[in-house]
């Protein structure tokens, strides 16, 4: 059993498919007469995509009770406009109840598309794209100028001839 949480809000139906794309940042360079070489770099930000079904009618059994699709859509809109990262969690549990593993990542909502298709009933489908968010901050550095070295004062003596 899968449970999906977006900023603490559990999706009513776990998406059928979850795609996690880990972007490589390696750089390929072509050498004269030597072919290609690959410079290995740290991976890029992870991108997560899935389609969430938001039931229009409360005819299903839900863990936390029925919520109308507009409550989920309002949450997605606020995540987009607030410009703040949030937690995305996927909990995977075996039929025996044993926890398999989790995906727990700080993300941003990159985009979402709302689709209503009359051929598929009254439910709303939302295609969601999330991107991994890595916290960063600026650091203030104070540059201290070194004090000039004190050189010993040498007095010049003049010799007087008698």
Which residues make up each language-model segment?
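Compositionally biased, intrinsically disordered low-complexity segments enriched in polar/Pro/Gly
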Residues: 1-160
